[in-house]
């Protein structure tokens, strides 16, 4: 059985953006096309992005 790599509330970086930014995982979504999906939100934003697990990296603590 496979599990999500990231957890709700975890800080991640989204690697497909041109500007480096830290996002927070807001929801875990089911697997689609062989990959887990997530809702992520940037601080101060009002909408979530839906992204695949391969597009995320764990954010470094500052």
Positions of PLM-derived features:
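Short glycine/serine/proline-enriched coil/turn segments at secondary-structure junctions
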Residues: 31-33, 48
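Residue-level recognition of beta-strand microenvironments
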Residues: 15, 28-30, 43
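Short aromatic-glycine-enriched beta-strand elements
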Residues: 35-39
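Short beta-strand-centered aromatic/proline hotspots
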Residues: 20-30
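Short glycine/proline-centered loop/turn elements that form peptide/ligand docking sites
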Residues: 1, 18-19
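Intrinsically disordered, low-complexity, charged/polar segments
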Residues: 41-62
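Short coil-to-beta transition motif at edge beta-strands of beta-rich domains
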Residues: 3-15
